[in-house]
A protein has these predicted regions:
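Conserved active-site motif detector
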Residues: 1-142
Length: 142
C-alpha cells in the first residue's frame, strides 16, 4: 500500500475511537468527492456525557463551532478540538479531528467563509457499539 493512501492514525487512542476519514475522499484541492463524504471524530469516548445531553435535547440541526487553527497551534501540532452548535448553545468538546486530517477541515472552513456562509460544518451524532460518535458531514460544504 502506498504511504499517501493510508489513513492517518493516532496510536495513543483506542482502536475504536481513532476516528475515520481518508484523503482518497477528496480531490486535489481538498474538495470532497461526494456530498455524502463524512469524517468521524476521534477521542469521543471521554465526551459520552456531553453527547448524551445533545441526544436528549432533541436538537435536529447540529453544526460545528470551531475556528481555524492559530499559527501557535499549527506549530505545536495541537489536536483540533470540536464543539457543536446545537440550537442556541455551544456544547463542550465532543471529539477531535483525526490526526493528519486537520487540513481538510481548515479548507472546508475557508471554503465556507469564501462564499459568505457561516463557517460551520454540518454534523450528526451516531450510536455505535462503542458509544456515541460524531460524524462531520463535510461533503455538504462542497
Amino acid at each position: 500500500m502506498d504511504f499517501w493512501n493510508r489513513s492517518p492514525v493516532d496510536p495513543s487512542l483506542p482502536k475504536d475511537d481513532r476516528g475515520s476519514g481518508s484523503f482518497n475522499d477528496y480531490k486535489y484541492n481538498l474538495l470532497p468527492n461526494s456530498v455524502r463524504t463524512t469524517l468521524r471524530l476521534a477521542n469521543s469516548t471521554p465526551c459520552q456525557d456531553e453527547l448524551q445531553r445533545i441526544i436528549d435535547s432533541g436538537e435536529g440541526e447540529l453544526e460545528t463551532a470551531i475556528s481555524r487553527r492559530s499559527p501557535e497551534e499549527e506549530r505545536t501540532d495541537a489536536p483540533m478540538d470540536i464543539r457543536l452548535f446545537s440550537g442556541s448553545r455551544v456544547t463542550g468538546v465532543v471529539g477531535t479531528i483525526p490526526r493528519g486530517l486537520e487540513p481538510v477541515v481548515d479548507e472546508a472552513l475557508s471554503r465556507l467563509d469564501g462564499v459568505g456562509k457561516k463557517a460551520r460544518i454540518p454534523a450528526s451524532v451516531q450510536k455505535t457499539r462503542s458509544g456515541w460518535r460524531v460524524d462531520l458531514l463535510i461533503g455538504q460544504t462542497r
